[in-house]
A protein has these predicted regions:
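Nucleotide and nucleotide-moiety/phosphate-recognizing core
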Residues: 1-75, 85-99, 106-111, 126-155
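Short glycine-enriched, charge-decorated loop/helix-capping segments at active-site entrances
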Residues: 71-78, 116-120
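Hydrophobic alpha-helical segments within soluble ligand-binding/sensing domains
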Residues: 80-83
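Active-site oxyanion-binding pockets that recognize sulfate/phosphate
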Residues: 121-125
Length: 156
């Protein structure tokens, strides 16, 4: 969702690339891409995109961050995130930047899959939507001023 909000801010639109198996929006400053696959198995598509366009900055949800929190990281482990593990496996390295959007954890461990796949409602939805907007602004800042400065501005 943050990548779509960023596309709006940059006044560009996504187009489907069957060759790359992704939705792609090109701008003078960056190529935005959303793999046309489930997050858990997006690694092959991200690796293909990286070969064409350079190192990715991956945006993903994070159970270990409170709902609405944002955090840039320059590299790191998958932290239990299957989609990030897929990207690491197919890029062959954990050394790529990422922006994590906190979704918090459910009350019960058994509910994790449903928690990740279900839309939040009410006040949680407002908090999440606010985080998506802030994430898009942070990504635009990274394009405008560089990732290091955007990380400082975000406080991560």
């Amino acid at each position: 969702m943050a990548i779509y909000r960023l596309a709006e801010l940059l006044e560009t639109r996504f187009r489907r690339s069957f060759l790359k198996r992704a939705w792609i929006a090109k701008t003078p400053r960056a190529v935005l891409a959303r793999p046309d696959s489930f997050m858990n198995v997006c690694g092959p598509v991200v690796a293909r995109l990286a070969k064409s366009f350079g190192q990715p900055l991956v945006v993903h949800d994070d159970l270990d961050l409170p709902l609405g929190a944002l955090r840039f990281r320059m590299k790191g482990s998958a932290g239990g995130h299957n989609g990030v593990a897929s990207v690491i496996a197919h890029l062959g390295t954990p050394d790529f930047p990422r922006l994590k959007i906190g979704i918090g954890r459910p009350a019960s461990k058994a509910d994790v899959v449903d928690w990740v796949l279900t839309r939040c409602e009410g006040a949680d939805r407002e908090t999440f939507n606010g985080a998506v907007g802030r994430a898009a602004e942070a990504l635009r800042s990274a394009l405008d001023t560089g990732l290091d400065r955007a990380m400082t501005e975000l406080g991560t």
